[in-house]
Regions:
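Conserved nucleotide-binding/hydrolysis micro-motifs of P-loop NTPases
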Residues: 155-157, 191-192, 218-221, 230, ...
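Hydrophobic, small-residue-rich alpha-helical packing segments that form membrane-like cores
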Residues: 164-212, 216-217, 235-236
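Beta-strand elements of modular eukaryotic interaction domains
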Residues: 3, 28-29, 41-46, 54-55, ...
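Residues that form ligand- and interface-recognition hot spots within folded domains
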Residues: 16-19, 24, 59, 83, ...
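Gly/Thr-rich phosphate-binding beta-strand-loop-beta motif of the actin/hexokinase/Hsp70
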Residues: 1-35, 198-238
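Glycine-rich phosphate-binding loop plus the immediately following alpha-helix
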Residues: 50-59, 74, 228-244
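Extended hydrophobic secondary-structure segments that form protein cores and membrane-embedded regions
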Residues: 11-13, 145-153, 183-188, 211-215, ...
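Phosphate-binding loop and its immediate beta->loop->alpha context
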Residues: 31-169
Length: 244
């Protein structure tokens, strides 16, 4: 069982690297209702709240990611699942054509799962920082101490989180900055969903209320129930152990 609270200033900036799509926010505001969602991505002329978690490498080794992946390129998705050991994946996912294809792609390109996640996170991070600098200015960004939150499946074991941490470090997210060290935090995906839902305008959760959160993604499904212990700030704990 686990418990968590929603702080008065939400964690920032959060990144949900999922199997098929990814969303990212620049959260410099104290008001949780005033969150800046990154919607501009390389390779597309329209605004999108999420981008496909897809990666390819050019003949020269250049990284193409998300909407920037050429339509005729050999690409990989679902690569985050490969951070898990085979004994910790179920049979259905093991025979998934996407997962088999991902393993073959990494073998062919001489990449590890950590390398693939790192390359994608690195491209995402550069794009995000560039957008924030454009909106806020370089001096403002240079003065900020970053706190980065990456959401992961609730049932992930410690070694998988360590692999994700290594990928984030390898991506340059944790590199030394004059403003101070960057803090990297992992949040369970259902917890992030619950936090997002409960801070929506007009919602008034009461003490003792129970919420069931179903996170049905492209590669995993988590279902967890939370009971509200207090409302100011909102503190919750698992009502029953989560399954996924």
């Amino acid at each position: 069982m686990s418990s968590f609270s929603i702080p008065s200033r939400p964690r920032s900036p959060p990144s949900d690297i999922s199997w098929r799509c990814l969303g990212h926010t620049d959260e410099l505001q104290k008001d949780p209702n005033d969150i800046n969602l990154i919607t501009n991505w390389p390779g597309t002329g329209r605004e999108e709240s999420k981008c496909p978690t897809e990666l390819s490498y050019g003949d020269d080794g250049k990284i193409h990611w998300s909407f920037d992946v050429p339509p005729d390129a050999s690409s990989v998705s679902w690569f985050k699942l490969l951070l898990l050991r085979e004994e910790d994946t179920n049979d259905d996912r093991d025979v998934s054509e996407y997962l088999v294809s991902a393993r073959e792609f990494l073998s062919r390109t001489n990449k590890t799962a950590i390398d693939a996640v790192s390359d994608f996170l690195g491209a995402l991070w550069k794009n995000t920082i560039a957008k924030i600098v454009c909106a806020r200015g370089q001096m403002v960004v240079d003065a900020l101490v970053f706190r980065v939150v990456i959401t992961v499946p609730a049932i992930w074991k410690g070694y998988a989180r360590q692999a994700m941490h290594k990928a984030a470090d390898q991506a340059g997210i944790l590199k030394e900055r004059a403003a101070g060290p960057t803090e990297l935090v992992f949040a369970n995906e259902p917890e992030a969903a619950a936090m997002s839902t409960l801070i929506e305008r007009g919602r008034r959760p009461g003490t003792g209320g129970v919420y069931v959160v179903c996170d049905a993604g492209g590669g995993t499904v988590d279902m967890i129930s939370y009971k509200i212990d207090q409302v100011d700030p909102i503190c919750m704990k698992e009502a029953v152990e989560g399954k996924g």
